[in-house]
Regions:
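Phosphate-binding/catalytic loop of phosphoryl-transfer enzymes
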Residues: 92-127
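Short, well-ordered amphipathic alpha-helical segments that serve as non-catalytic structural scaffolds
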Residues: 35-47
């Protein structure tokens, strides 16, 4: 799932899908990072957006250590944990990693949220 927000308004969203054949090419979930990042960037371009249009990037989820719901800056430790997948291999582990790669290319901040209520809280903070 991807979405672009302008402050608190969800401007556009999509559910990008991948075939079983595409996914089967990868041994680990983290190996899918570049493929999924490229799909998101291609989708943005198709919709008329560039990385320079972004002010921040937010990923969602990941099987991380126990922590309260909320918004967290993506750190090197968080990235290490998401790649190592100590808590399990899951596509949600890619949320913070993809956000980090896109933010790095755009030269902007990157964050990860734990759940849907964290997203709602983040939107409220932006109002």
């Amino acid at each position: 799932k991807v979405a672009l927000f302008k402050r608190t308004e969800n401007v556009i969203q999509n559910n990008l899908t991948h075939s079983a054949e595409e996914i089967a090419k990868f041994e680990r979930v983290s190996d899918q990072l570049e493929m999924r990042q490229a799909l998101i960037e291609d989708w943005m371009k198709e919709e008329g957006y560039q990385l320079s249009d972004l002010e921040a990037v937010v990923g969602r989820g990941g099987l991380l250590r126990s922590m309260p719901g909320g918004t967290y800056e993506v750190t090197s430790k968080m990235k290490e944990d998401l790649i190592a997948a100590h808590r399990g291999e899951h596509a949600s582990n890619l949320g913070g990693l993809i956000a980090d790669k896109i933010a790095e290319k755009a030269g902007i901040g990157v964050y990860n949220i734990k759940n849907e209520s964290s997203l709602k809280n983040l939107i409220e903070l932006l109002k």
